Amino acid sequence: MCGIVGIASKKNNLNDILNGLKSLEYRGYDSCGVAGVSDEKIFFEKSISKIYELEKKINKRKIQSNLSIGHTRWATHGKPSIKNAHPITKEKCTIVHNGIIENFEELKIKYKIDKKLIITDTDTEIISLIIERLLKKYDDPSIIIKKIAKHIKGTY
C-alpha cells in the first residue's frame, strides 16, 4: 500500500516529510522517494531500500525545500526499482500516485505521447507526461487536472 506526505510551508520541511514517511512504514513498501523545490528547481531522491537510506541521500546533498512531497510505493505497474519509484519527475512536473490507472495505454494514444519520452514501467508516468504537455497550453494547474481527470479510469 502506498503512502503520500506533502507539505508546503515557510521553512525547510524535508525532515517533516521523512518523519511522515517513517510513520507510514508499517504499511509496507518496496521503494520510496522525495521531491521538492530547491533554488527554484525541482529535485528528487529515490531509494529501493529503507527510508533511512533515502534520508542519508538527502542529507548528503544538503537540500532545503519548503514545498515537498514524499511517497512510499507498493508496485502495481512496473517492478520495484529506482526508475519506477515515485515521485515521477519531469521538467516542470512531479507526481505521486496511489492507485491504478486502468486506461494508461489508451491515454498514451489519446495524447499522442512519444514512446521515447517514457522512462518508467509505471502507469503514473503517463499523467506526468500529459501534464507537461498541457502546461504549454494552460497556465492554471487546476484546469489541467480537471481536463486529465475526465479521461482517467481507475482508482486514485
Identify the residue ranges that each predicted region occupies:
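Conserved short alpha-helical segments that host acidic/polar catalytic motifs at enzyme active sites
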Residues: 1-156
